[in-house]
């Protein structure tokens, strides 16, 4: 009985450590997208968000799941008042994937602050000018021990980042 407080403390600490990564990802979504904290729910060891509405100025269906050291995002255009060009949609959603992954995959990367600084982000491989560049094939790369994958098709983008070591 005298060890009960210690056991409870260790249990709470373990739960808080597991929630820290998920909470940080939720915070990025809160700042960079229309997905807010109320769109998230727990399912097993994952935090899942489902959002249908305007995001980045486009009506879309966005789904995200976060486990410890793993992020998955799927964005798909849903019929709405504004239909973007497929290439524009691919660019917007690719940029969002890069923005969400960046604080975790390349936390020390500093975005350029002057017009003549052309230091590329290690995640720039995710960006495309048009869908013809991708030919609907997934692009994968390992960056700082994270396996990054992005796949685009007409009006749909899926991306994931998973810590591999």
Segments from the language model and where they lie:
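Sec-dependent N-terminal signal peptides
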Residues: 3-13
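Long, charged/polar, surface-exposed segments that mediate recognition or autoinhibition
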Residues: 62-127
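Short, flexible coil/linker elements and helix-boundary hinge sites characteristic
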Residues: 12-13, 34, 145
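Non-cytosolic coordination micro-motifs
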Residues: 103-165
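N-terminal leader/targeting segments
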Residues: 16-84, 88-91
């Amino acid at each position: 009985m005298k060890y009960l407080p210690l056991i409870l403390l260790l249990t709470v600490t373990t739960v808080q450590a597991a929630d820290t990564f998920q909470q940080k990802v939720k915070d990025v979504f809160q700042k960079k997208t229309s997905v807010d904290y109320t769109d998230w729910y727990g399912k097993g060891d994952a935090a899942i968000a489902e959002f249908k509405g305007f995001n980045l100025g486009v009506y879309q269906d966005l789904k995200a799941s976060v486990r410890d050291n793993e992020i998955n995002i799927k964005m798909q255009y849903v019929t709405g008042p504004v239909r973007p060009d497929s290439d524009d949609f691919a660019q917007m959603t690719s940029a969002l994937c890069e923005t969400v992954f960046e604080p975790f995959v390349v936390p020390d990367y500093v975005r350029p602050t002057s017009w003549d600084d052309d230091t590329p982000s290690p995640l720039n491989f995710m960006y495309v000018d048009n869908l013809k560049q991708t030919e609907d094939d997934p692009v994968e790369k390992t960056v700082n021990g994270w396996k990054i994958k992005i796949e685009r098709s007409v009006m749909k983008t899926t991306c994931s980042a998973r810590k591999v070591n």
